[in-house]
Every structure is written in C-alpha cells, then in structure tokens.
Amino acid sequence: STVYLAWKHGCKPIGTFAHELYATYQGRADVPVAMAQKKVMEDWSTEYDGSLGIALSDNFGFKSFLNDFGLKFAKLFDGCRHDSGDPIRWGEMLIAYYNKIGIDPRTKVGCWSDSLDIDKALAIAKHFNNRIKVSFGIGTYLGATICGTKKKPLSMVMKVVEVNGKPVTKLSDSDGKTMCQNEEYNNYVRQVYDYKSIDDMTVDEIIKILPTFKNVWLTDIYTPMAA
C-alpha cells in the first residue's frame, strides 16, 4: 500500500523488504533453507542497485542475521531495520558490529519499527544521537489509530506460513512474534540458523562476538507515560 501511495503522489518510497520475502525464499526449491537469508539480501541489492538499502534483521533472529550480514552486505546496505527484541540492546549490538568490522556506525542507519509511538521513538533517537543515523517506521500508532478517540490502535498483520506446499517460518527476537504452523520445521530452522533471541543472550555471550557492546536496555532509558 505504501509503495502504491508513493507512486500515486510522486514520492520516493523509503523502506525495506518484509518478512514475507524471507519466508518465500524458504519455500523455493532452488534455495537451501540455510542460504535463504543471504540469498534475499543478494537478490534485493541486485534488483534495486543500492536503493531501498535497509536490511530487515530479525526473521531468523538478529544474532543469525549478523552471521550472514558480513562486510560485503554491511557495505552494500545503508543500514538495518529492528522489528523485535529490545530496541536499545539491538541498536547497541548493531553499533558494536559495525565497529568490529571497521565501519563507522555514524555512516549507517538504524531503523526502528516495532510497536513504536512518538515518545518511544524520541527516547531511542536521544539515546543513539551522534552514534548512528536514526530512522523510524511507525505504522500501527500513526496509521491505524481512530482519530479523536482513545481506542487502542488496530493491529493487522499477515505473514506467509506455506510456500509451494512447504512450511516456512518467521522466528523473530520477541516471544509471541514467531509465525509458523509447523513445529517440527520451526525447530529445524532454529537449529540451522543457531537461533537465540538477543533478549535471551547473556552479556558475556554478546561481548564474545561483539567486544565493544554496551549493555543497555529500553527500560534503562525510557518509561512509558502510562507506567
């Protein structure tokens, strides 16, 4: 819908690919499941030739994503998108990753899009100011709120669960956001990608792979107004 609106109004589309792309590639006969994540990034960067350069980072978990991202994709893509797990911990890991591979994180973009409202976005922006370029995708709060009421915003999500007769999955870094209708396949993909949620990783586990990581959580820098 947003691509259509950009075309209709003559605006430049800004964004990234969706979880559905990672899911669809799992169902392709010519793509091994273990290569689905890399293949998506390869094909996307080839198709758009540098445009729309924000990589979605959580379909198989952010830890697994960083294993596949590497120096090549880190240079090709403008930045990465957060959509699950603690947003501050994710940002600290992303900055530490860029530092590790010799890229100045201030030249890259962190794009947050998970359950945002204006106050949370401002808190994230303040925390990462001058450390990485900050961008936000605010959908539900801005696009599905009934104006002039206190009704809870509508949350409408569609994901791919089967392709060519094969189950597919979205793991994510948050409890409750996994999307798969086949438990056996879901467990298989977790093993293939050595999955572990960033929220469940210990500080020592993270520092072992990202030595400059700073252990900060959203709750350390932000308290919701209603709390």
What are these regions (language model features)?
Residues S1-M93, Y98, A123, F128, ...:
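Buried, small/hydrophobic-residue-enriched core segments of structured protein domains
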Residues F62, L76, G85-K108, S113-A227:
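Gly/Ser/Thr/Ala-enriched C-terminal appendages of enzymes
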